[in-house]
Amino acid sequence: MKAFGFLKIAIIFMVSGSSTATIQKTAHPALPTPAQLQKMSSRFSPTPMRVETANLTVADRQALAKLVEAARFFDEIFLKQLWSGNLELYLTLQKDRSELGKARLRYFWINKGPWSDIDDYKAFLPGVPPRKPVGSNFYPEDMTKQEFERWVATLSPAEQESAKGFFTVIRWADKKAGTLAITPYSEEYRDQLSKVAALLREAADLTENASLKRFLITRADAFLSNDYYESDLAWMDLDAPLDITIGPYETYNDELFGYKAAFEAYIGLRDDAETAKLSAFTQHLQEIEDNLPIDSGNRNPKLGAAAPIRVVDQIISAGDGAHGVQTAAYNLPNDERVVNQKGSKRVMLKNVQEAKFRNVLVPIAMRTLSRNAMVDVNFSSFFTHILAHELMHGLGPHQITVDGRETTPRAELKELFSAIEEAKADVTGLFALQYMMDHASAMKLGTVLPSDDAAQRQMYTTFLASAFRSLRFGLNDAHGKGMAIQFNYLVDRGAFVEHGDGTFSIDMTKIKAAVQDLVHDLLTLEAEGNYSGAKEMLDKMGVIRPVLKRAFDRLQGIPTDIEPIFVTAEELVPTVSSKPSATPKPSRKKSVRKK
């Protein structure tokens, strides 16, 4: 839940020895002009990210500088993961100093590629495929799903696991024979990962925090061994002022199967006061699991250890965490072995969320909600629901049995899983918050979760406004497609109401039951590993209907998301390469301060 550019990003690209494809000369409709590219870029509101680091020890501040330097390498790796011709194209764009060249370079850097994330991955540059390859560069661009599946069927169980694993790329061994080869990330990206590993070890030598030291050392080892299990466990135990997430995690860019993880980095400073306050929610997750509106046999009678929550102010993000729509929070790791043993961790990027709320959500609410509903939109409801969303990724079915096989919803739903899972986390988050509001007194949540009628109305109304925000990400984004399911379902149930003037509000007499029913449907799809049912739901509900198109027409000129400018990171470690963006830095008077 994951634009960039005006500040200089230090990326020292390895030109020699890199594997790049010949850029395809593909015909396109008329490509955007400089003015049109500027308009496309303006959908991302430039937002300086300042974080006060004065309270860090000298050692941790020195370690932070090493981590910022390490994070920047992930932009290079991600460029390679997205498309085989990406790095060569980026280097070419930097040489074009014309007005058009500068506009192209800037929008390329926002997307980390030549396809616009929020325009269904449509190409905006010449000489590239008209759309992002569905398998990105995790697989051969000309490989079909059927070719992969036929080849996998010939492998041993261990080889099949590796072929479908998070941390391998697939290449042709002999295309005529239909045979493929498996290459671990540790080999495919060794040049960059060896440098990152060295920087992590330097940071580990500097910090005095034992848990941070252990995570950095084990993650450095993982980058070279391709085994991330021990470092994922160490990440779950991380308890330090510097909050670090760095590695291959999310699989959204693998639209072919949803198997392959992209590299990303988030470096931030923990907000201890907010973290302590929100951690109260984790004490009640088992009770919520026990009351999910799903067949009791599909509930988890014993969740993993209480899921830790971290509220963080982001200093820098990179790689998969730094393109298109920005991540506001995340729930990791995705390794089910770790989730079963230790649960998962929810990280809330508070300064990112504040920027999204201020620059995007409030303007959207002013145009899409009725006047009476508008007063119910507030940041607290927005922030709390994002937390609930991340918590809900850890609830519901994770290990299932299909036709006698032990498997997972992710494995059974394949490329459909991400959209179904994002919809499930959203709407189950509403269900969970409503449950906690209904039991706030018994749960002793009164100080962190208001539960009166006004608070409930504010929660649902803020979610409605945020639905329009998410839907603008486009249907190729798992969050956007997942939100389309929810929006259409709740409109059909009369819970979201459109008025004659084109504005919307909540019908409080219908919303609670509609949410509960949708939670049931989504959780059941996952519990049964029902691929055909998930496809039917997505085909029917994961669409933009006329009611949404009318609403979108009212949102012209409002940014879709933010474009973070990592001011503090730049001050800590000034970059040495020419900046990717061709636009001057905005005035610092817009900077975000969060202590």
List where the protein language model places each region.
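Post-HEXXH active-site segment of zinc metalloproteases
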Residues: 397-423
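N-terminal helix-rich structural modules
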Residues: 27-207, 211-215
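Long, well-structured alpha-helical subdomains associated
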Residues: 430-536
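C-terminal, non-catalytic "cap/extension" segments appended to globular domains
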Residues: 488-595
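Active-site recognition of the HExxH zinc-binding catalytic motif
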Residues: 381-398, 425, 430
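Bacterial Sec-dependent signal peptides at the C-terminal "C-region" and cleavage site
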Residues: 14-32
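An active-site-proximal "capping" alpha-helix that borders the catalytic cofactor pocket
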Residues: 209, 418-436
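Contiguous, non-catalytic segments that form substrate-binding/exosite surfaces or channel walls
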Residues: 185-374, 378
